[in-house]
């Protein structure tokens, strides 16, 4: 039976009154009881911006509306105690977006990006010497962490991804058709921040393995939301010199006037809304999805109806709209003089306020509360854990007892706790989950059953993680994702044993897939992976610089092998198996593997995040022949005027071979040489070319399968450098 969700925080409205064009048929419209808390949060943010950053119109045309502010109707399921800080964060997003759009040179995106990435890793943002924007972001993190640390971290990660996208996106203007424009516009709709705010506000946790699937489900919703924004903002934007708006593009595409353009756009909005209404219905009845994912999709439908109603009356899009009386008083005198009116003094809403304060409790908070007094529900009492490993028995020196043990076949079992501990350690580190996203996005085409897809994800993640354990050991890497490498905690022997155990486990999973070809595919790609790694180690140990061709073949075998295994296993388990060969997706896997590896080579040398997570220019410590280093060496060899630099580089690489690492000063010398040979610029240019080829390959596959793949394109966009 499809679940029905409690709606204690809102009241149902007659959508037909507020949606005369019937844009969101089939979706209810609800209004939050704690609407006033949204206004308070928005005004607090505006006041802080003026105090910490600079001037701002009063009131600012952000999320506020005279009848309905945005969250009030777009997230009617928001837990009341989370409404104010959620609104504060959203208003900051509105203000910051306007700064980017109007004054890109003043946007301080790098500072914001760095701060949010710090928040995503640590749960706090350093404010010392920070910009006003970063101080505000730190305030948001503090308030959210005090309420729900687990989901506050999701907000920080999602927001950081959104800022990163804004900083790196390419401004495109020459769209000829609506279908060309929609993918670009949908990426720009602010979904990444909105995802974090909704999951925080409603206390939802999406399992990592279902995140990419959620993005796929939301494709028509993001399309509809972005087109609704364009529909209502066109009046404000239509005289802009560089207008980017769906109404304008429809007019240009069909050679029609504004009235017809609007009607055509409304028809497309209704079409996308209907798609999402069906997705909401289908999702509720699925047995292979978590309850939180189902609830998330259900909650997101109100974003669509709420967005329509808010857009129709908000001052952000309607320049003649007037603020309500309380909003004008708060804008003039501040929220300190006109504080929140919720919950009302008569106690009429106390029942939902109290319900909200416990319903939204995160798992971590619940465990913490339970451990204060009594059993903590894990493996101990009052927060004191029992040892993870217990001894088999008490040692005895009595001959008869020892002989009895030696002859017994009924000894206690040894658990897998010890062999799994190094693996559990590395998997506890933060991961971006690109491989899971790749599986889910590719499955948009292959329709591989959920049970098989889950197993394939496990196989790929086991192999990838085990490879990282061995790579770090073989390269003598001190850090992995900012923490000590596994072998530096558990030692080389236990690390090798634990990694090898994962390979055997993954083999068993591959053998358990329904298509017997899967084990053959698994073995073929594992062999490729080991051979590729052998060349990487051989070149490093013997200080042999490979050719570009040798390097790329090694990458195809080592890095591309896992992506190739992923696509081949999914194809083998797909109901389309008879219609497509297991090599159909090989070009995509090959390009992704090359792009990933060369991107990793580049980031290792230039990224501050990589330096924090792995150490400064760590590839040079390892003596690894990266794409950039190969270009540098080959350029030096071809240019006699750089003979001195060539000799110096060779001496430094030999020094690394003898001492096992390089000083930071030596690494900076090598980076200076790379600047002379323009090797970093060359690598970046190759990455951009590869990304273009990847985009073309995705387009080829979209035509072949007859289905656009928004999730895959979003993943590729996030990887762009």
From Swiss-Prot:
Similarity comment: In the N-terminal section; belongs to the terpene synthase family. In the C-terminal section; belongs to the FPP/GGPP synthase family.
Intervals of motif DDXXD 1: 97-101
Entry domain remark: The conserved DDXXD motifs as well as the NSE/DTE motif are important for the catalytic activity, presumably through binding to Mg(2+).
Cofactor, how bound (note): Binds 4 Mg(2+) ions per subunit.
Binding sites annotated in the UniProt record for Mg(2+) 2: 97, 101
Composition bias, Low complexity: 372-384
Record's function text: Bifunctional sesterterpene synthase; part of the gene cluster that mediates the biosynthesis of the sesterterpenes ophiobolins, fungal phytotoxins with potential anti-cancer activities. The first step of the pathway is performed by the sesterterpene synthase oblA that possesses both prenyl transferase and terpene cyclase activity, converting isopentenyl diphosphate and dimethylallyl diphosphate into geranylfarnesyl diphosphate (GFPP) and further converting GFPP into ophiobolin F, respectively. Other sesterterpenoids (C(25) terpenoids) are found as minor products of oblA.
Positions that bind Mg(2+) 3: 471, 475
PROSITE patterns registered for this protein in UniProt: POLYPRENYL_SYNTHASE_1 (PS00723), POLYPRENYL_SYNTHASE_2 (PS00444)
Cofactor(s) needed: Mg(2+)
UniProt motif (DDXXD 2) ranges: 471-475
Binding annotation for isopentenyl diphosphate: 432, 435, 464, 481
Keyword Methyltransferase applies: no
Record-linked Pfam families: polyprenyl_synt, Terpene_syn_C_2
The protein's annotated pathway: Secondary metabolite biosynthesis; terpenoid biosynthesis
Residues annotated for Mg(2+) 1 binding in this entry: 97, 101
Alphabetic keyword roster: Isoprene biosynthesis, Lyase, Magnesium, Metal-binding, Multifunctional enzyme, Transferase
Region (Disordered): 348-387
Catalytic activity, EC: 4.2.3.145, 2.5.1.29, 2.5.1.81
GO MF term set: geranylfarnesyl diphosphate synthase activity; geranylgeranyl diphosphate synthase activity; lyase activity; metal ion binding
The protein, known as: Ophiobolin F synthase oblA
Recorded superkingdom: Eukaryota
Span list, region (7Z)-ophiobola-7,19-dien-3-ol synthase: 5-325
UniProt-annotated binding residues for dimethylallyl diphosphate: 480, 558-559, 597, 604, 614, 624
């Amino acid at each position: 039976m499809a679940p029905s969700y409690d709606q204690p925080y809102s009241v149902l409205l007659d959508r037909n009154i507020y949606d005369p064009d019937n844009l969101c048929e089939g979706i209810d419209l609800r209004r939050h009881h704690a609407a006033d808390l949204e206004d308070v949060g928005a005004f607090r943010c505006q006041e802080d911006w003026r105090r910490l950053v600079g001037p701002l119109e009063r009131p600012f045309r952000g999320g506020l509306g005279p009848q309905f502010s945005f969250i009030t109707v777009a997230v009617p399921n928001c837990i009341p105690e989370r409404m104010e800080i959620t609104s504060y964060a959203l208003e900051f997003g509105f203000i910051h977006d306007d700064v980017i759009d109007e004054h890109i040179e003043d946007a301080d995106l790098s500072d914001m990006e760095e701060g949010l990435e710090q928040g995503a890793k640590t749960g706090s943002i350093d404010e010392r010497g920070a910009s006003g924007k970063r101080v505000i972001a730190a305030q948001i993190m503090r308030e959210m962490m005090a309420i729900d640390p687990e989901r506050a971290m999701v907000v920080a990660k999602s927001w950081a991804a959104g800022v990163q996208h804004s900083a790196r996106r390419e401004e495109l203007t020459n769209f000829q058709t609506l279908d060309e424009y929609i993918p670009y516009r949908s990426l720009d709709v602010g979904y990444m921040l909105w995802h974090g705010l909704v999951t925080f506000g409603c206390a939802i946790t999406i399992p990592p393995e279902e995140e990419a699937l959620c993005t796929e489900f939301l494709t028509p919703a993001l399309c509809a939301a972005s087109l609704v924004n364009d529909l209502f903002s066109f009046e404000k934007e239509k005289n802009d010199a560089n207008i980017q708006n769906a109404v304008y593009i429809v007019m240009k595409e069909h050679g029609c006037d504004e009235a017809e353009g609007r009607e055509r756009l409304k028809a497309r909005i209704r079409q996308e809304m209907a798609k999402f209404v069906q997705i909401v219905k289908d999702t509720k009845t699925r047995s292979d999805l978590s309850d939180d994912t189902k609830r998330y999709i259900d909650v997101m439908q109100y974003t669509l109806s709420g967005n329509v109603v808010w857009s129709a009356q908000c001052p952000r899009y309607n320049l003649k709209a007037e603020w309500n009386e309380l909003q004008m008083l708060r804008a003039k005198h501040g929220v300190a003089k006109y504080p929140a009116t919720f919950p009302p003094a008569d106690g009429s809403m106390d029942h939902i306020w109290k319900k909200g304060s416990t319903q939204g409790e995160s798992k971590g908070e619940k465990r913490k509360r339970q451990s204060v007094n009594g059993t903590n529900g894990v493996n101990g009492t009052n927060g004191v854990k029992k040892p993870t490993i217990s001894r088999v028995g008490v040692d005895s020196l009595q001959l008869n007892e020892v002989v009895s043990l030696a002859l017994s076949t009924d000894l206690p079992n040894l658990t897998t706790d010890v062999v799994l501990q190094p693996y559990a350690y590395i998997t506890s580190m933060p991961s971006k989950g690109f491989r899971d996203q790749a599986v889910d996005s590719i499955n948009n085409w292959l329709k591989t059953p959920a049970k098989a897809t889950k197993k394939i994800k496990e196989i790929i993640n086991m192999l990838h993680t085990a490879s990282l354990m061995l790579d770090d050991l073989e390269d003598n890497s001190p850090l992995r994702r900012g923490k000590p490498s596994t072998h530096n905690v558990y030692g080389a022997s236990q690390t090798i044993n634990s990694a090898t155990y994962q390979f055997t486990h993954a083999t068993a999973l591959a053998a358990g897939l329904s298509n017997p070809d899967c084990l053959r595919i698994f073995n073929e790609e594992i062999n490729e992976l080991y051979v590729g790694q052998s060349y990487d180690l051989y070149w490093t140990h013997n200080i042999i610089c490979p050719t570009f061709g040798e390097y790329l073949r090694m990458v195809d075998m080592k890095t591309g092998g896992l992506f190739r295994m992923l696509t081949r296993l999914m194809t083998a388990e797909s109901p389309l198996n008879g219609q497509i060969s297991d090599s159909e997706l090989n070009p995509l896997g090959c390009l992704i593997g090359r792009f990933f590896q060369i991107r990793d080579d580049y980031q290792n040398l230039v990224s501050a995040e990589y330096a924090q997570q792995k150490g400064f220019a760590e590839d040079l410590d390892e003596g690894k022949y990266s794409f950039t280093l190969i270009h540098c060496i080959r350029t030096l060899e071809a240019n006699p005027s750089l003979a001195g630099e060539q000799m110096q580089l060779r001496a430094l690489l030999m020094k690394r071979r003898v001492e096992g690492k390089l000083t930071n000063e030596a690494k900076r010398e090598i980076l200076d040489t790379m600047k002379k040979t323009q090797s970093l610029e060359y690598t970046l240019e190759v990455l951009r070319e590869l990304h273009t080829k990847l985009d073309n390959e995705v387009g080829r596959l979209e035509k072949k399968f007859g289905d656009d793949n928004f999730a895959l394109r979003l993943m590729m966009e996030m990887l762009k450098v």
